Amino acid sequence: MISLLLILVMSLFFSGIIIRTKSILSGRKGPGILQPMLDILRLWKKGSVVSTTTSFIFQIAPTAYLASVIMAVLMIPHGDKPGFISFDGDFIMFAYVLAFGKFLMIISALDTGSSFEGMGASREALFSMLVEPAFFILLGSFALFTGQNSFRDIFSSLHYGSQISYLLGGLASFVLVMIAMIENSRMPLDDPKTHLELTMVHEVMILDNSGFDLGLINYTTNLKFAMYGALISNFFIGLLPLEFSIPMFLAIQIGFAITVGIIESFMARFRMGHNPQFVFILTSVSLLIFFGVLLVLGKFV
């Protein structure tokens, strides 16, 4: 439960820290850290305009999207403290609960009958499909490394004792940072501020969403960022007591947000044809982690 509370708190500030970092690096004053959340609150006070060509799927998709992410957040532990939902193989359910929310957002984009939104939905589906092997190879490698098969047991059993194992932790953090940026449609795969429909991915999917529904989608993006930050922090928290683990959690989340801001400040968006190649590289990095685990365990023949 403590993990849920910490993630909810960080979700209020995450997007603001990213924007503030980008503002400082570009020499601008920029908005306050809470401005993105204030924008979301303003959207929540408005009604939603729903096209007459859409079905009930378009109306329930934003709520189901948020619910799926909250369900996934409930499975994330905090060090040796289990999540609200914890069982053997929970990381598999974690991935497919997120996939369920993404699926509903994709079919809601198709439900509008817009060719632009259908184009964005196909791109989103492709990138999510390419990310999935990297996530499962990564978590499967650490399950093999620790001999455990649940989030809580994997993270509480991590034992770093060699240079290779420290390298594995660094590579795992890199993979999760990239997965978070891909899943939230950030640079270098997508530009959340672009106004050119032909280069959009996530933004073109939600062109018909407005008001309260758009606020739900934007907040869910912040929540997903904080959720992946919590996964990264668990690689380093281990068995630390709460008085040390909570400050470390917050420091890692802030560092994660600053890292995203730095990446977006100094990297241009890739050409659309290069995006699948970049996403698939994450699977190669996850395979390196898998082979590293085999080396550490002495099973590499």
Regions found by a protein language model. Name each.
Residues 1-14, 86-99, 161-183, 244-245:
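Alpha-helical transmembrane segments
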Residues 27-44, 191-212:
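Juxtamembrane inter-helical linkers in multi-pass membrane proteins
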Residues 42-58, 115-119, 206-212:
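Cytosolic juxtamembrane amphipathic/interface segments immediately preceding
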Residues 70-85, 105-114, 144-150, 297-300:
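Transmembrane alpha-helix boundary signature
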Residues 142-169:
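Juxtamembrane/interfacial segments at transmembrane-helix boundaries in multi-pass membrane proteins
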Residues 203-206, 210-245, 249-261:
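Alpha-helical transmembrane segments of helical membrane proteins, especially in multi-pass transport
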Residues 259-288:
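Interfacial loop-to-transmembrane junctions
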Residues 289-301:
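Juxtamembrane boundary at the C-terminal end of a transmembrane helix
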